[in-house]
UniProtKB/Swiss-Prot annotation:
InterPro entries, sorted: Mito_RNA-Proc/Resp (IPR051240), Pentatricopeptide_rpt (IPR002885), TPR-like_helical_dom_sf (IPR011990)
Top-level division of the source organism's lineage: Eukaryota
Gene from which this protein is expressed: EMB1025
Keyword annotations: Repeat
Provenance organism: Arabidopsis thaliana (Mouse-ear cress)
Swiss-Prot/TrEMBL PPR repeat ranges: 76-110, 111-141, 147-181, 186-220, 221-255, 256-290, 291-325, 326-360, 361-395, 396-430, 431-465, 466-500, 501-535, 539-573, 574-609
Any GO BP annotation: embryo development ending in seed dormancy
Family annotation (NCBIfam families): PPR
Designated name of the protein: Pentatricopeptide repeat-containing protein At4g20090
Amino acid sequence: MPKCPIPIRISFFSYFLKESRILSSNPVNFSIHLRFSSSVSVSPNPSMEVVENPLEAPISEKMFKSAPKMGSFKLGDSTLSSMIESYANSGDFDSVEKLLSRIRLENRVIIERSFIVVFRAYGKAHLPDKAVDLFHRMVDEFRCKRSVKSFNSVLNVIINEGLYHRGLEFYDYVVNSNMNMNISPNGLSFNLVIKALCKLRFVDRAIEVFRGMPERKCLPDGYTYCTLMDGLCKEERIDEAVLLLDEMQSEGCSPSPVIYNVLIDGLCKKGDLTRVTKLVDNMFLKGCVPNEVTYNTLIHGLCLKGKLDKAVSLLERMVSSKCIPNDVTYGTLINGLVKQRRATDAVRLLSSMEERGYHLNQHIYSVLISGLFKEGKAEEAMSLWRKMAEKGCKPNIVVYSVLVDGLCREGKPNEAKEILNRMIASGCLPNAYTYSSLMKGFFKTGLCEEAVQVWKEMDKTGCSRNKFCYSVLIDGLCGVGRVKEAMMVWSKMLTIGIKPDTVAYSSIIKGLCGIGSMDAALKLYHEMLCQEEPKSQPDVVTYNILLDGLCMQKDISRAVDLLNSMLDRGCDPDVITCNTFLNTLSEKSNSCDKGRSFLEELVVRLLKRQRVSGACTIVEVMLGKYLAPKTSTWAMIVREICKPKKINAAIDKCWRNLCT
């Protein structure tokens, strides 16, 4: 018979049973682990089914507080540890602190495992500071020796919270400081440090730590290699990541599907499908079975390269290998097909998805409907919309907005307005994009008053107007000659604190140019130049509007000055810029020589600034107008293009085009 090291009086058990009857009205399942070879469990009602609630501490502190009145019973250290762990797991940190204070006052001893439980609980509650504070108090206040286990627990809490700099500082303080903590990092410690360094893009420093692990008698594991490969891939250092795979295998560490997925993703983003194929072959040779992440990554890579047919074939292979496609798989494929203007093929894929029992979501429907409208297949888009309703898939704000925008593109704003009304009736409130699309649709069909009415209706649904809404209204009003009203809207926008972007500025400048107010338009242009926001700086559209306005007024001198400013600010002319000046110069002279000379001068100026792309655009315009450049101009173009870097870039572009 096992010997009991602590005498327990019968009076305590009598009290305990009495207490349990009192508590039976509010049943709590608890058990007392005595120092026998087996545990003794006592339940308020033996016939009652045990119900465990992980959010409640399983030990009644009230019971233990009352127990000393009945005899010499004293809580053991193991009981206090259990209570701390219970409070921590239930998130009751106030009780944890109270109990820790009691333990400190009574000079009791708590095992390290209990502290680790509290550290993890602090991590789940996003309280890294409390975890660090308790770690520093372990020895002095609780006489608990810290080991690498508690150190790793706190380090993990800090790094999982995204506090990477703080995590590295904590590591350095514990391991390298003169605090004599006598904690030597292990493999997990190094993995956490490497993770933090890679997240901070200090990949070279992470490699140094990785190379120094054997000196600390720690060998890298699969997680170490995977973390480092991921960091290298994010820095576009794919070759180094692939070399690590070879090194890993030579060290006898078998790569997991996660490692292959990281490398495949990096190679796909680089567009190196040849090496991706070799890597997948290597994966199969090593007996590593691709999972849904592998297939999704490969499909995404094929879609990026425009190889949609191969992506669809890979989907079939995925299904045949009994790997179930998910939302990401189908979403990637359908997005790829729609971007390639193959929405009809995407609809066919949709049918095969349904045959496999896949239930389409709002995202898939919105992408398909948008794609069909952009390809001018409005009837098919509306048919899909009706099918969506038949399938019981409730449209969300994205689906409704896509429908409104698509119908407006087709010149059917009244039908789009009906969709908007149905949207509101269903309890789905339109956003700024929905209203802006409808306003643009009405303006496009000449229904200016209806567009203004939509603007007013935004107040009824409580939709706040953004800079895009104001840009649409200003552009629409200017388009029908109502520039004064547009200026009033502009003033209101500035008054309420909305900073106009390039589109808004360009819209009001276009309106002012349309009524011949060039000075006011140029004043706004100079105001744009003073803006700190890059999104408020003039672009080629802004310059073309101003250049056209100046040329319409025959103010060639100021137009040339503005063109010079455009070039100085790094904005290259486009086809519209060239045509604007060619038309103006042709009106002044029937000869084409002035136009050719003007454009050639532009080409030379751009080439001298190494802006080859802009120069080539102008040359294309010249050739389209049968204005062949001089031999000297061609020579400059060839010399600039044939520089080593330019040749390599051209070759890479050529290969990319061949691959697609």
